[in-house]
């Protein structure tokens, strides 16, 4: 039995434990009285908030119960916010505003956003200075600067901008990064050493090289002791690359080794950095159902835990630095998907891997569904994204990226990127859905029914993967890819057969609709040429040191030393393309699955 089989057993055992505790609470008078006393104490500790209209509400919504068995069931199945099994949320007061004075107090007229707003907006276009300008635009009114970075195709594949055949791809769909100097330009003007600034990088294949460049750029600006202060996330999810994207560069064994070295380094030296974001988003966008997204994301996560432990790494050291990334679409499963993932992760980490509380937390970034956005009657995408934001917040996501309505046509324009950001602000700051009270819908019959069905389906998918020999065995048999492809095919048939409504496309379509005049955002040829010239200049200036650094990197890869620790030195004199080429010479190249 692989760890997935053990996790299925652990979740089933937890269900049995809950049932046993419920029976005991009802049959043992002493236990029942203790639970009733605890319930009263919990409710007495809850503070109150006052809405702008003067309504006084508890800051935490709890059901009215006087049956010890139901109290036991609620505490063990739902849990209080921030308490095992974290079904409600990972933290106690996630979106709540500070406790407010009465509405006639002058302080209520002061506009102050929630203390840790979850808004993250994805940006990446052209050269480093172009994306830097977009970052400053998107964050100009934000107290917390959350810089989420998209990279262009050559960067994602670790290819230098001077390589043959890539000129037309430079800066398209993301930012072009070749050297540590590009990285300095990318985040210029942001205080990377401050707690209100964090950086996210959506890149997996060459992730260790890019993170090394980021560390190097931060050291140049803020000094050699800056690493413990850096906040952010890098994706680095090599398993989902095989299952859904094919942007892997190195063979799977080497990729896992490089990843483990980076996670080990960051866990010990960068306590505010997440060196991996275990990602279901791309799995969902490739065509997976919500259940498949949850099952493959969780199973990949547990596989990483197994692998890191096999390398002698301590789960209580690296566990708190694992993060997750899920898609949120419009299917009803999204009412509870992230909640269920949080619960399964906590049980698996605690009961199978012996992790402590910090390592049990499923820390989640959510992005609204890109696949749900369509070109037909495209302004409806504003509504689709708004609904998805509400669903994401109902699942207590820790951060959120909302897509721009014009994405079916082009890289997000400034106008619609602003609307996407404001949609989150309207949901969390303007509306009262989440800022006054935690747990508004947790425990509701509908949410419980959906959650239980999703949990059962995820465990069944775990059993299927376990029968394939675990995640790696299933990957080798193309199991996940084939399931994703089949689900994608079914979805398309449902859409074009009219079974699945898409407003403006197969229902209530406007026959007179004309396509909008949306300017295509492209990187001018002169900028692409400038990027090549910068790369040539960097490699020429460092020609004396680069070969020596690459030779030393090769030695480290062939030994048992930490590769990432050496990369932090290598990037000072070598470009992304040079490093990738040398690593491929040593470990080989990944052969994409077709």
Task: Show the residue positions of the predicted features.
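Flexible, glycine-rich loop/tail regions that form catalytic "lids" or insertion modules at the edges
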Residues: 1-136, 144-153, 425, 429-594
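Generic secondary-structure signature for well-ordered alpha-helical cores
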Residues: 16, 143, 188-192, 219-223, ...
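Catalytic alpha/beta active-site cores
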Residues: 23-334, 352, 356-365, 393, ...
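Conserved active-site and cofactor/substrate-binding residues in soluble primary-metabolism enzymes
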Residues: 126-130, 142, 178-181, 205-213, ...
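Residue-level marker of motif borders
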Residues: 167, 174-176, 390, 438, ...
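Poly-acidic low-complexity segments
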Residues: 191-193, 226-229, 237, 251, ...
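A short glycine/serine-rich beta->alpha loop
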Residues: 197-203, 288-289, 372-377, 408-411, ...
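Active-site capping/gating regions of soluble enzymes
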Residues: 295-299, 323-504
């Amino acid at each position: 039995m692989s760890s997935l089989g053990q996790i299925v057993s652990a979740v089933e055992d937890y269900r049995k434990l809950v049932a046993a505790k419920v029976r005991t609470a009802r049959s043992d008078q002493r236990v029942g009285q203790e639970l009733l006393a605890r319930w009263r104490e919990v409710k007495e500790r809850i503070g109150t908030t006052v809405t702008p209209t003067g309504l006084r509400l508890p800051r935490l919504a709890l059901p009215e119960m006087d049956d010890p068995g139901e109290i036991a069931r609620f505490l063990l199945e739902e849990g209080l916010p921030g308490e095992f099994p974290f079904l409600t949320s990972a933290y106690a007061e996630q979106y709540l505003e500070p406790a407010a004075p009465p509405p006639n107090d002058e302080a209520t007229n002061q506009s102050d956003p929630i203390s840790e707003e979850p808004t993250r907006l994805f940006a990446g276009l052209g050269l480093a200075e172009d994306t830097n300008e977009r970052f400053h635009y998107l964050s100009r009114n934000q107290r917390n600067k959350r810089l989420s970075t998209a990279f262009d195709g050559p960067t994602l594949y670790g290819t230098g901008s001077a390589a043959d055949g890539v000129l037309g791809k430079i800066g398209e769909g993301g930012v072009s990064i070749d050297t540590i100097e590009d990285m300095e330009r990318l985040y210029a003007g942001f205080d990377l050493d401050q707690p209100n600034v964090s950086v996210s990088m959506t890149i997996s294949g060459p992730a260790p090289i890019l993170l090394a460049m980021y560390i190097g750029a931060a050291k140049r600006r803020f000094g050699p002791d800056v690493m413990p202060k850096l906040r952010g996330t890098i994706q680095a999810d090599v398993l989902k690359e095989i299952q859904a994207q094919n942007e892997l560069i190195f063979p799977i064994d080497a990729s896992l080794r490089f990843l483990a070295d980076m996670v080990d380094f960051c866990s010990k030296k960068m306590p505010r950095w997440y060196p991996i974001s275990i990602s279901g988003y791309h799995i969902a966008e490739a065509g997976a159902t919500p259940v498949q997204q949850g099952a493959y994301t969780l199973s990949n996560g547990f596989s990483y835990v197994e692998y890191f432990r096999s390398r002698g790494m301590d789960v209580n050291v690296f566990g708190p630095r694992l993060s997750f990334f899920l898609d949120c679409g419009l299917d009803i499963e999204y009412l509870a998907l992230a909640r269920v993932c949080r619960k399964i992760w906590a049980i698996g980490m605690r009961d199978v891997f012996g992790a402590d509380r910090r390592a049990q937390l499923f820390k989640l970034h959510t992005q609204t569904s890109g696949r749900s956005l369509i070109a037909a009657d495209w302004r409806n995408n504003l509504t689709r994204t708004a609904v998805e934001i509400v669903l994401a917040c109902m699942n207590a996501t820790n951060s959120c990226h909302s897509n721009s309505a014009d994405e079916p046509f082009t890289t997000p324009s400034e106008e619609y990127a602003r609307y996407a950001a404001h949609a989150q602000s309207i949901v969390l700051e303007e509306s009262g859905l989440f800022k006054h009270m935690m747990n508004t819908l947790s425990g509701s019959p509908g949410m419980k029914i959906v959650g239980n069905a999703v949990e059962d389906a995820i465990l069944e998918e775990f059993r299927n993967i376990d029968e394939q020999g675990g995640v790696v065995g299933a990957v080798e048999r193309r199991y996940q890819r084939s399931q994703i492809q089949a689900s994608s095919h079914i979805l398309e048939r449902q859409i074009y057969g009219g079974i699945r409504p898409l407003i403006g496309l197969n229902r209530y379509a406007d026959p007179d609709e004309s396509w909008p005049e949306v300017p295509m955002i492209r990187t001018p040829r002169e900028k692409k040429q400038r990027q090549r010239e910068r790369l040539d200049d960097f490699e020429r200036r460092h020609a004396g040191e680069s070969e020596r650094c690459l030779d030393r990197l090769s030695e480290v890869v062939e030994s048992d030393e930490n590769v990432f620790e050496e990369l932090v030195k290598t990037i000072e004199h070598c470009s992304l393309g040079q490093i990738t080429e040398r690593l491929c010479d040593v470990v080989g190249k990944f052969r994409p699955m077709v």
